[in-house]
Amino acid sequence: DNFLKLKKNNLFIDIAKRLKAYQAENPDKKLIRMGIGDVTLPLAPVVVEAMKKAADEMGVKETFRGYEDSGSGYDFLKEAIAGYYKKFGVSLELDEIRVNDGAKSDCGNIVDIFGDDNIVLITDPAYPVYVDSNKMNGRTVIYADSDESNGFAAMPDPSVHADLIYLCSPNNPTGSAYTREQLKEWIAYAKANKAIIIFDAAYEAFITDPDVPHSIYEVDGAKECAIEMCSLSKTAGFTGMRCGYTVIPTALHVIASDGTDVSIAQI
């Protein structure tokens, strides 16, 4: 029944079909694609060479890699991710970082650890995966409008309760980004509601304004209420390769249905 609540057509597939039909009728027209956030350039040569080397290593007994022990990614990659966050003044432990096959997967899968009766707040417009993954689990989804009246930066309404909050900054699809002061307001709202923020930072590399955080963890208190997801799709052209990561701070705790205090990082 929950699957029947989804829209009949996938947004990106529908756009692709319309593009294909239009191009067939107008072969001389050059289109600027504003649909799915794909890349337009190939992988960097250094990435290609590293992948070739990694493939060669898999064919040698001494350098072959099988299952990774921690289940959350190789340390050499997590160390590189932690090093990247240090540029923003954010300190992460390796066991707070989970490497995945792209942010999209974790955006959908992360909700499995939360109760189906949770109320989910999503800024609108938003990446369709946020809505679909929660509707498939039967959750109530409410919206905070992002439009010209608020500079395309939806802010929390203290009179509205939510258990899960999806924020994307810079936003997909509007491109707007939250300032530190705006994120402070969302963090205060989340704590007041004992809610969890799922912060999508897939487009953080496009930020140039020094007042706009690359990570929600640049703001005090975020580690107690936020899970952050990021991707190499936009920073390294990995849309066809699938690699990203999720950060779950050890300081992030939730209350289970039986009243026990649970560390999400241990789930």
Model regions and ranges:
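N-terminal small-domain helix-loop-helix segment of the aminotransferase-like
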Residues: 5-101, 109
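Hydrophobic/aromatic beta-strand patches that form the interior of the parallel beta-sheet core
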Residues: 32-34, 121, 142, 198, ...
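Conserved core of the PLP fold type I
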Residues: 61-190, 204-219, 227
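Walker B catalytic acidic pair
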Residues: 201
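Local beta-strand N-terminus motif with an aromatic residue
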Residues: 31, 117, 162, 194, ...
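Short catalytic/ligand-binding loop motif for oxyanion handling, primarily in non-cytosolic enzymes
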Residues: 40-44, 173-176, 205-206, 236-239
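Conserved core segment of the aminotransferase class I/II
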Residues: 218-267
